[in-house]
Amino acid sequence: MSELTEKKIGRELIYDGAVLRVVKDEVELPNGKSSVREFCMHIGAVAVIPVLPDGRVLMERQYRYPHGRVFFEIPAGKLDFSGEDPLSAAKRELREETGGVAKSYTFLGELDTTPAITDEKIRMYLAEDITFCDRELDEDEFINLEFVPLSELYRMVMAGEIKDAKTQIAVLKVWQIREKYRNM
């Protein structure tokens, strides 16, 4: 198998915003030639799939400006600062967006969202044993909440009705976990 690693030669900062940075790196390719890689640097994010004892999942409907439409997705958000504990961020996002406070969190894995254009990683958690209180949405957040049976979400993912990748993966992982225990 041939070597695939590219070596960074230099970096130019193109844009430095509140949520992401855009950089242009000059790299040395495995064959010794050079090329340019442009990508977004992201602080990282978390996603939480909150599942109630009866199998319903608390979902969000939220307008996503880059796509110009409302998405149906699980609660999620970016880390507030570099080095923030992802589980703490997941707890914060669940509380702020849904008013949910869970006693149990299970790490479901890490997702590299779009590796060709960003280094963003989303750490995903299953939240269970949840109590609810008032939400604490940011002033620029507008989110509608909806409880949906996990079986219906699974059907929606398989039918292509849920377009959000983190939600698809979280639903499939939780479905697989539940199926494993059902068949024991």
For the regions a language model picked out, list residue spans one by one.
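A short, amphipathic edge element
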Residues: 2-12
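Short beta-strand micro-motifs in enzyme catalytic cores
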Residues: 21-25, 70, 121-123
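Hydrophobic residues on conserved beta-strands that form the core of alpha/beta folds
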Residues: 22-24, 36, 60, 74, ...
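Short loop segments at secondary-structure junctions
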Residues: 31, 52-56, 63, 128-132, ...
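Unchanged
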Residues: 35, 44-47, 78-165
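C-terminal boundary of histidine-terminating zinc-finger modules
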Residues: 171
